[in-house]
């Protein structure tokens, strides 16, 4: 790839910067959980006894493993997405919104189930699973921050898609006439899938 293929102005886009923030949040979320190799009081009394006096690691908990997998996957996605912004190869706004929506649901499930597990009590009613597990608690917090930032990205992308009359979702074509505020040509109405050249730097009030 030559230097001329890269658009340096992409980093000025609020959407690009939001993705960069999410990249750091997701990296921190999975790294702190992956480093939690002891001090978890669970997932059950038998397993805790096997782990010994220092407690269990995150790998003994299915929900914590799920959190790590989702955050690693989203971190890799954000790295790829930032690269696509820089080379101006981002998919249509409709496609981008749907991808964000899928990750939004997965991250919400990951951090909410992990938070619930973290507050479970196995041995003592006053001693939750994550009482001494600062890494796990930090991981869940950063997963939540990732989700909140992703919600903002979805809002920006939704507004962008709305401004394009909901065109550009490859699976359905142009279905703007079925969406609020749309006035396009229906399911096969000839809407294009190319995004305007100024989308990467567009801001919204």
UniProtKB/Swiss-Prot annotation:
Residues 88-90, 159-167 are extracellular. Keywords: Cell membrane, Membrane, Transmembrane, Transmembrane helix. It is a multi-pass membrane protein. The chain crosses the membrane at residues 67-87, 91-111, 138-158, 168-188. It is found in: Cell membrane. One of its GO terms (cellular component) is plasma membrane. Belongs to the Casparian strip membrane proteins (CASP) family. This is CASP-like protein 0U1. It comes from Micromonas pusilla (strain CCMP1545).
């Amino acid at each position: 790839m030559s230097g001329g293929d890269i658009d340096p102005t992409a980093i000025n886009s609020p959407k690009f910067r939001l993705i960069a923030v999410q990249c750091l949040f997701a990296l921190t979320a999975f790294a702190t959980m992956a480093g939690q190799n002891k001090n978890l009081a669970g997932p059950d009394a038998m397993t805790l006894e096997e782990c010994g006096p220092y407690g269990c690691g995150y790998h003994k908990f299915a929900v914590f493993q799920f959190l790590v997998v989702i955050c690693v996957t989203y971190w890799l996605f954000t790295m790829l997405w930032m690269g696509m912004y820089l080379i101006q190869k981002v998919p249509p706004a409709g496609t981008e919104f749907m991808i964000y929506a899928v990750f939004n649901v997965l991250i919400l499930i990951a951090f909410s189930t992990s938070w619930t597990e973290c507050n479970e009590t196995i041995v003592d009613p006053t001693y939750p699973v994550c009482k001494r597990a600062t890494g796990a608690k930090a991981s869940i917090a950063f997963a939540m921050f990732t989700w909140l930032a992703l919600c903002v990205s979805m809002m920006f992308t939704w507004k962008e898609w709305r401004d394009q009359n909901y065109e550009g979702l490859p699976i359905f074509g142009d279905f703007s006439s079925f969406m609020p505020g749309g006035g396009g040509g229906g399911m096969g109405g000839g809407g294009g899938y190319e995004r305007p050249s100024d989308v990467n730097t567009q801001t919204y009030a």
